[in-house]
């Protein structure tokens, strides 16, 4: 999945890093200071929500866009409470991820239409 995300995004954005677990995400985000981070709720070592909490607590300015299989509005609320601006379901990645990132860059929220929120 990570390779598919990078392939989709590299035509539209500069990709400064990619990682496969939540701990590495926090470490690399602190080092690279990206404008936007695309993360999954279900990640190894730290979940995406735990990583978001750490980033938010450390004062990260990165805008967070969650890409996930979870469609529960409880997850959407929790992600937004941890500083997320985007919530994209993996089933809608090809159509929703780029608009979600663009909205996040403008400090606006985006939720895949398949999710009731």
List where the protein language model places each region.
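Two-component/phosphorelay signaling modules centered on CheY-like receiver
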Residues: 1-17
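Acidic catalytic/metal-coordinating carboxylates
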Residues: 21-24, 46-50
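Active-site beta3 strand of CheY-like receiver
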Residues: 32-38
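Receiver (REC) domain active-site loop signature in two-component systems and cognate sites
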Residues: 43
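Short amphipathic alpha-helix used as the core "switch/output" element in two-component signaling
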Residues: 49-60
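Short, conserved "switch-loop" micro-motifs in signal-transduction and mechanochemical regulators
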Residues: 70-71
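Short, flexible helix-to-coil linker/hinge segments that flank and couple to helix-turn-helix
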Residues: 76-81, 86-117
């Amino acid at each position: 999945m990570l390779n598919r995300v990078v392939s989709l995004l590299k035509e539209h954005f500069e990709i400064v890093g990619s990682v496969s677990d939540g701990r590495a995400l926090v470490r690399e985000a602190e080092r690279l200071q990206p404008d936007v981070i695309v993360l999954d709720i279900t990640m190894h070592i730290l979940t995406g929500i735990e990583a978001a909490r750490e980033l938010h607590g450390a004062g990260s300015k990165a805008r967070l866009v969650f890409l996930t299989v979870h469609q529960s509005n409880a997850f959407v609320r929790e992600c937004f409470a941890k500083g997320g601006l985007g919530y994209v379901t993996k089933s809608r990645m090809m159509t929703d991820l780029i608009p979600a990132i663009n909205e996040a860059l403008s400090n606006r929220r985006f939720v895949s239409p398949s999710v009731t929120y």
